[in-house]
Amino acid sequence: MKIGFIGLGVMGAPMARHLAYAGYEIVTVLNRSPLPTDLNASVVTSAAEVARMSEIVITMLPDTPDVERVLLGQNGVLEGTSAGKLVIDMSSISPIDTAEFAAKFRQAGTGYLDAPVSGGEVGAKAASLTIMVGGPASEFERALPIFQKLGKNINLIGETNGAGQTCKIANQI
């Protein structure tokens, strides 16, 4: 299975590496961080192209404006997605914006999960992250084998998009 992974920074690079080592084919876009040499990923020029080439797209980005730009901006994931695909945002962002992003993807027939993590760089490297997921149970079940390559404590917080982000905020307090 091809997984698009956008955001290969401190957290995203080790997460993508775990997926590659598990046998998933990784597709990514040129970004600020240099591509890890052991990742053996296909590199394309836009988030839309990542979406076209992948069954599932994962984003792990610094903040809400970055996620919005990558998902909904020009040449963003939404432009390249189609019915039956799944977007998983693992960034820690606004639950309100998350619900709005999810609605736009659902209109395109694309599934959407918010799945922020706790555990930091150490957890990302050790594949021991806590993953707090918001979205439909059927999409959670579809993504669970992927989550199990990234974390140890994986919970569907609620079947509403934004539930994972809300839990993450509460976890930070």
Question: What does each model-found stretch correspond to?
Answer:
Residues 1-58, 85, 121:
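NAD(P)+-binding Rossmann beta1-loop-alpha1 motif at the extreme N-terminus of oxidoreductases
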Residues 2-3, 88-89, 172:
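Short, contiguous strand/loop micro-motifs
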Residues 5, 68-73, 152-154:
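Short, composition-biased local secondary-structure segments
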Residues 7, 11, 15, 35, ...:
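General structural feature for long, well-ordered alpha-helical segments within catalytic domains
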Residues 7, 28, 59, 89-90, ...:
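Small/polar loops that bind or transfer phosphate-bearing groups
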Residues 44-52, 56-57, 64-129:
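Rossmann-like NAD(P)(H) cofactor-binding subdomain of soluble oxidoreductases
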Residues 92-172:
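Rossmann-fold dinucleotide-binding core
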